[in-house]
Amino acid sequence: MKTTVRQLVTALGLTFVVAAGAAAAPIPELVTKDGRHALMVDGAPFVMFGGQAQNSSNYPLALDKVWAAIKDANANTLEIPVAWEQIEPTEGKFDFSYVDTLVAQARKNKVRLVLLWFGTWKNTGPSYTPEWVKFNNARFPRMLDQEGKPIYCLSPQGEETLKADKKAFVALMAHIKKIDDVQRTVIMMQVQNEVGTYGYARDYGPKAEAQFNAPVPAEVLKHKKSPVALAATGTWKQVYGDYADEYFHAYSVAKYIGEIAKAGRDVYNLPMYVNNSIRDSLEEPVKPWNKNFASGGPTFDVIDIYKAAAPAIDFAAPDIYSPDSRKFVATLDKFQRPDNALAVPEMSNGADYVRYAYLVLGRGAINFSPFGIDYADYSNFPLGHKATDKTMTAPYGKIFGAFRPMERQWSKWAFEGRTYGVAEGDDRQPQKLALKGWNATISFREWQFGEAQYFKDVKDLPANTEKPNGGVAMAQIADNEFIIVGQHARVKIDSADGKPTMWARVEEGRYDAAGKWIMERNWNGDQTDYGLNLTGNPVVLKVKVGTY
């Protein structure tokens, strides 16, 4: 018998009723200790080994292709949109059947959810707003350019727009609470998507102009000092000079988002964050906006302004679509702060990016989620992978498959500051990690046997190393014990005090469901004489070292 969407939702409703009799799990929350952060799920640290669906897969009949890709990627979390246009196509009339279907299917697939609220802004534009918003400029005003002409972007000064978006978001949060207050399948919310404005520094409408020419709010002055020697107080231009337009726009957008987030959290207090299309992380010194990124978005230079204007937002996170290794590392450096959790909620799914899983996870991130983990017939090449099949998901599946059996242990170690990570740089050079009492050297393009100087006439290089794709993540679980997972890399560990060092034991294995280490074999001889040589098939090693 063919099952209709109505029948499916009815059946799902029964599932929710049954679940309501169970004891509620603790609500997810973001916690901070000693400048480190953890997402607590079911009362314990939880790292999202995730994947983000395509933008148009947020409909019940499209989900099968999403779940298939998430399964092949071995992901524990799906990020997927919930669009304003789909839950409130007619003003005041809400339809949450998609949300019901999504949550029920996530439970069936044993996957957690991060819901992406595509409301007023998606990639700076209003394309996911309902039609009754899109075409009513009188009620829902667009930003105005310097000549007073409306542009593509809805104004953050639009009071009616804010009121309507907030109403829809609150209704969504209330519904999530209704169906998920026990099982906590939904663990986090993204509020809007890649906000700001391309090509325009800010809104020049009457309300915006009045605020721009008024004194900078005290909460902003407290968080964001002037990058140049200007007035300590005054108007935006007086305090921030050439940076004033971007900073004011960031404040306006952040305040708008913050009001929506707070209203939603007042109903159901899930963690919430904002993402952004990043600016050049290598630019030093950071220059004023010059049409080179989305002005007003939560780029690294205005995180402080977002903290001031939107305290209901837990953190700002980068969407990364540049494979340049120096920029990637610099971006993580800019966003990983004592007051800002590191997360990469969106990244290219291209082959050049796979190696960064080890770097991001090793640095203690709470989320690593490539974009387009979805078998829908759409490829975002050249930003992403050419194909939308298993050739795209398999590399992530191998890595996540290595981490997932120890996901709770890894999450705990990361929160305790015990984890480290590297990704092979574009220069292909060895990298060092300063561990507690030890130094690790990670090199790349090495054969498993011998040292390069032994075989100077050998010109061959290991297969699949034509481009940088190596990486290693480590956790120091005791003074002289480590968990190592990686690919296409050689790992050596030496004592930090210079004493001769040797391997005491190198076990290959895994953690079982109860958290017990299961050894499959012990490496020795050729497998350890020249460091620990990791191939393209990620393995998990439990390593003990000593000095003599």
Q: Language-model features: where?
A:
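Bacterial N-terminal signal peptides
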Residues: 9-19
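N-terminal carbohydrate-binding accessory modules
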Residues: 24-76
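The substrate-binding groove and active-site-proximal loops of carbohydrate-active enzymes
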Residues: 48-58, 81-99, 146-167, 179, ...
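Polysaccharide-binding and catalytic clefts of secreted carbohydrate-active enzymes
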Residues: 138-303
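C-terminal beta-sandwich/jelly-roll accessory domains of carbohydrate-active enzymes
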Residues: 445, 449-474, 479-548
